[in-house]
Amino acid sequence: MSEPQSWSVMASQMTSAQLIRVYLDGSMGIGKTSMLNEIPTHSLMGVPVLKVFEPMKYWRYYFTDLVTTVNDTCDRRRRGEFSLFQSSMIVTALQSKFADPYLVFHERLSSKCHRITGTRGNPSLILILDRHPISATVCFPIARHLTGDCSLEMLISMIIRLPQEPPGCNLVIVDLHDEKEHVSRLSSRNRTGEKTDLLMLRALNAVYSCLVDTIMYANHICPYSKDEWESEWLDLPWFDTSLATTFINEPRTDYRGSRVSLHHTLLAIFKRRELCAEDGSLSTTHAWILWGLLMKLRNINVERFNITGLSTTKCVESFMDTMSERLVTHMSWNDAFEIEADVLAYNKEMAM
C-alpha cells in the first residue's frame, strides 16, 4: 500500500483536484452502513477517503422520530385507523423530512463538481456517501406506494423533488439475493421503532433493481430520443393491482438485452388512467414530470453490487478494488478543502 499523501503535498503536485464520488445505496438493512464503517481512510494508492454517514440523528432526534412515526402510520393504515388519504399525507410529509439532509448536502456538493475527466484518473479525493437523494425522493416513496401506504398523487409530488445531478455521479446499488439473510440482518439491527416488514422489503428490493434498468434506459434515450420514448409509452400495459403484485413478488433478473426497454423501468408504474388520456398518452404535465425524471437520471453512472455470500471485509475489498473504473470530476483545491469541512460538520450533527 502506498503511503497516505498529505493534502499540502497533493495540492502542490496538481493544478486542480480530482474527485471520485460514490453513493452506496440499496434496500434497508442490507449492510451498506457496515461496509462504510469498514472502508479505510485511505485507498491502496494512498488517496484520502471521506465518508458521509446516514443522517440517523436528524431522523430520530430533530423534532419528530421519523423512523418510528412512518412505521406506526403504515401499521395504522393497514389496521384501518387511517384512510389512504390520511396515511398518504403523513407518509409524504415524513418522507420529505427523510430527504431534507440528503438534499441540503447534495446542493452544497453539486456546486463543487465540474467537468468529468473520465475514468481511470488519478483522484485527489474519494468521497463515499451512504445513500443518494434518489433513495428518499424516488425509491422509498415508490415502495410505499406499491405497499398501499402512499397515493399516486403524493408519489408524483415526491419524485419531482429529485435534484439535478452534476457530472461524475457513481451510484452503486447493493443487492442481496438471499431474502432469509436479508431479513436476518434487518431484524438483528434491533432499532427502536423499526419493524421487519417483509412486503416493504420486497417492494424496496424490486424498486432498486428496477432503478438500475431505469438509469440505463435514461442513459441511452436522453436527451435525443423523446419521440421514441413516447412511442414506447403507448405500448405499455395499464399498471394495475395484479402488475403491482407481480412487480413486488416475482424475482427480477438483470436485464441483458442490447437496450433496456421502457417496460423494464420504474416509469411503467406510472401508466395509470388518472395520468393519461383515453388513448394512453400522458397528460402534458405528467409527461414533463416523467421525462424530467429521465433527464435527471441520465448523468448517473450506475452499477449493481451483489454481496450475496460475501463478508463485510470482502465487500469492502471488492468495492475499493474497482474504484479506478469510476467517473472522476475536476474541482478546485479550495472546493476539495470545503468538502472535507462540510463532511466533518455534517457527520457531527447528523450521524449517530
Curated annotation (Swiss-Prot):
Binding site for substrate: 95, 191
Biological processes, Gene Ontology terms: DNA biosynthetic process; TMP biosynthetic process
Highest taxon of the lineage: Viruses
Matching HAMAP family: HSV_KITH
InterPro entries from the UniProt entry: Herpes_TK, P-loop_NTPase
Catalytic reaction list: thymidine + ATP = dTMP + ADP + H(+)
Keyword Transferase: yes
Single Gene Ontology MF annotation: thymidine kinase activity
Family, per entry: Belongs to the herpesviridae thymidine kinase family.
Subunit architecture: Homodimer.
Enzyme active site: 54
UniProt entry tagged with the keyword Transit peptide: no
EC number(s) on file: 2.7.1.21
Annotated protein name in UniProt: Thymidine kinase
Keywords of the record: ATP-binding, DNA synthesis, Early protein, Kinase, Nucleotide-binding, Transferase
Job description of the protein: Catalyzes the transfer of the gamma-phospho group of ATP to thymidine to generate dTMP in the salvage pathway of pyrimidine synthesis. The dTMP serves as a substrate for DNA polymerase during viral DNA replication. Allows the virus to be reactivated and to grow in non-proliferative cells lacking a high concentration of phosphorylated nucleic acid precursors.
Gene3D superfamilies tied to this protein: P-loop containing nucleotide triphosphate hydrolases
Positions that bind ATP: 26-33, 185
